[in-house]
Each structure stands twice: as structure tokens, then as C-alpha cells.
């Protein structure tokens, strides 16, 4: 496989899609369907599962809720709400423009963590699948799969866009100056000063994903710092 000059690896949740808004909508729907107490129990199960898996699994948490409440007919309604959610309405402003912009210099690839059902559904319904021409990678722990990323999308230089400082730092430690890390300050991870302070700053920080259009490949590559830690 020919090696690209650049490959742009872009996260989904709170990078391209406002997942915090999705969670707010789900909480509201759960409260309407099952009441406040059971809504809170769903999120307890959700957090337990996230700790176990390392990623958010909305349908998995709903299945656990169903085991605890086998005769709750509202489970099907909540499942339908998730599967048919209008994710395209939750794209951050400028998300698709940012993808189109970077594709001038190389493939744009979705690099995400998640389950094997809901995450692909989210990517498809949001229009992101089409925007990146089907270049989708979904892992359990993406920072542990860099060899596979390189095999599938070989490049002289990578640009990684992610709202989680932990992920940016972990991948920077492996790839060093071969990757430019870009930190869009969107979502609860990016806006948590304690969480952000735990890690070195990204090579490039932008206020929102749409601001990526102000950067070209040459300047992004020049911004890459050496390996940290």
C-alpha cells in the first residue's frame, strides 16, 4: 500500500458530534419514559459499564437496565430513541467543513472508540461515513491499536484531532514528531481544567473543530513537537 504524505485521524464524540447534547436529550427522554429514579439507575449502569469497557456503551447499559427491569415495556421506546436519534443535528458547526478542508492533503479517517453497533450507526446517521468516504476505524482502546492504524493508513505524517488530552498524550508518546496533536476545546473532557492539567499541552489547540480550516498541512506538520515523557 502506498504511503500517504498526510493522514488526518479525527475522533467523533465531542470532536465532531456534540455528544454532551446527545446525553442531555437521552436523560430527558429516559425521565419522561421511566421516571427520575430509573433514569438515574440507567446512568449508574452506564458508568459501571464504561469503567469496565473503557468506552461509552449506551445500548449495553440499556441491556443491563433491561435485565434489572425485565417487564419494563419502555425499554423498546428508549432503544428506538437511540437507534433513530438525529445525529446529523448534533454535528458541531464546521465539522463537515473541517473534514473537507483537510482532505486536500490526505485521507480523513474517523478514529474512534466504541461498541460494534451503536457507534457505527451514529457515524452513518450523522453523515460522517459519507464525509470521510467510509474511512472508519472503531476500536476498544484506539491508543493501543496504533500499529493497525499505520498498517491500514500508512503516512509520513499524521494529524490527530481529539477532545481528550489523555488520548492525545498517549499517542504522542508513541509517535512523537510523526504526529501533530490537535486539541479542540469542546465537550466536558476538554473543559475540565483538572483533567487538562494532567497532561502536556497539545501541539495545536483550537477553540472548536471548525477552526481547523484556518490551518494547512504544512503548518500543522511544523507544529509537531518531539516525544514527551
Description of each model-found segment:
Residues 1-44, 67-68:
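Active-site neighborhood of HAD-like aspartate-dependent phosphohydrolases
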Residues 1-5, 124-160, 164-229:
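Asp-based, Mg2+/Mn2+-dependent phosphohydrolase catalytic module
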Residues 15, 22, 116-117, 166, ...:
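Conserved Rossmann-like nucleotide-cofactor binding loop
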Residues 16, 108, 160:
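Conserved SAM-binding loop
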Residues 22, 33-37, 46-83, 101:
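A metal-dependent, Asp-based hydrolase signature
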Residues 59-60, 64, 80-110, 143-148:
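Short, acidic loop-to-helix structural element flanking the phosphoryl-transfer center
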Residues 96-109, 113-137:
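Substrate-recognition/cap helix-loop segment adjacent to the acidic, metal-dependent catalytic center
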